[in-house]
Structures are given as C-alpha cells and as structure tokens.
Amino acid sequence: MRALIQRVSEASVTVEGELLGEIGPGLLILVCAMQGDGEAQASALAARIAKLRIFRDEAGKMNRSVRDTGGAALVVSQFTLAADTSRGNRPGFSAAAPPADGERLYRHFAAEIAACGIPTATGRFGADMKVRLLNDGPVTIWMET
C-alpha cells in the first residue's frame, strides 16, 4: 500500500456538497492499495503511521505521534498514488489494486487507524471528492509497504 501523509491544522472532504468528514489538528492520509496488497499490508501501514513522530514536542522537535497529541486522521482513498509516469505524458494506473480489493483494503486501513485510538473520519471510495486542508509546516511524508 502507498500513503501520502500530511500534517494538518484542519482538513475536510465533501462529495457533491455533502460534508463526509472533517478533522482539526492531525493527519490527512491519502491511501492507495496496490496490486497484490492484502490486509497484512494495510494493517502494517496503519500501525507505522499511528506511531510516526512528525508533531512537535515542547522543544520544537518532531518527536510526537498523532496519538501523543490527541489528533485525528482523515483517511481518503486516492488510486492516483499508483500512477506510473515512466513513459509518455499520460500516467498509467495498472499497478493499483482492482476496485473491489481497493475498497476493502481502504476500509480495513481506516478501521486499523481507528483501532489505534485515533479519531478517524473518511471520504467515500471511488467518489469525486473535494478535499480541503491547511497543511501544518508543511510536513508531507510518503510511505509504502
């Protein structure tokens, strides 16, 4: 699985004007299941992100996790993280998991983040979503399993 993690002051996701999820300080996690991924990869990635120390401590160092700060997570599916741009001008997405697998793993990943004790909001798999965020730092991290 692949994830693009952004430390945010706030973030929200809407579909057709309907607010699906919003958070205050925490993490916006854009996530993509890849061909061959399973629940083990989704669980491992969620556990790593839950422990990722990218929030400032009292000394201003990135030494605290989202759990340590009492922050939340907004988890949004984004199959375009599977883009292959090695040839031509149009990205290919064949490395992404098939939609049924992608949705199952997206839901599993979000549930695993929540099981780590992190308040979790989500988008809608496969929908045309509008994501708003106020990046804090900015801090943006790429992770893969």
Curated annotation (Swiss-Prot):
Motif segment (Gly-cisPro motif, important for rejection of L-amino acids): 137-138
Enzyme Commission number(s) of this protein: 3.1.1.96
Localization, UniProt: Cytoplasm
Enzyme superclass (EC): hydrolase
InterPro entries recorded: Daa-tRNA_deacyls_DTD (IPR003732), DTD-like_sf (IPR023509)
SUPFAM superfamilies xrefs: DTD-like
Molecular function terms from GO: D-tyrosyl-tRNA(Tyr) deacylase activity; Gly-tRNA(Ala) deacylase activity; Ser(Gly)-tRNA(Ala) hydrolase activity; tRNA binding
Gene Ontology terms: cellular component: cytoplasm
GO term, biological process aspect, one: D-amino acid catabolic process
This protein's UniProt keywords: Cytoplasm, Hydrolase, RNA-binding, tRNA-binding
One Pfam family it belongs to: Tyr_Deacylase
Top-level taxon of origin: Bacteria
Catalytic function, reaction form: glycyl-tRNA(Ala) + H2O = tRNA(Ala) + glycine + H(+); a D-aminoacyl-tRNA + H2O = a tRNA + a D-alpha-amino acid + H(+)
PANTHER family, sorted: D-AMINOACYL-TRNA DEACYLASE 1, D-TYROSYL-TRNA TYR DEACYLASE
Family stated for the protein in its record: Belongs to the DTD family.
Swiss-Prot/TrEMBL domain comment: A Gly-cisPro motif from one monomer fits into the active site of the other monomer to allow specific chiral rejection of L-amino acids.
Assembly: Homodimer.
Function recorded in the entry: An aminoacyl-tRNA editing enzyme that deacylates mischarged D-aminoacyl-tRNAs. Also deacylates mischarged glycyl-tRNA(Ala), protecting cells against glycine mischarging by AlaRS. Acts via tRNA-based rather than protein-based catalysis; rejects L-amino acids rather than detecting D-amino acids in the active site. By recycling D-aminoacyl-tRNA to D-amino acids and free tRNA molecules, this enzyme counteracts the toxicity associated with the formation of D-aminoacyl-tRNA entities in vivo and helps enforce protein L-homochirality.
Annotated protein name in UniProt: D-aminoacyl-tRNA deacylase
Organism of this sequence: Cereibacter sphaeroides (strain ATCC 17023 / DSM 158 / JCM 6121 / CCUG 31486 / LMG 2827 / NBRC 12203 / NCIMB 8253 / ATH 2.4.1.)
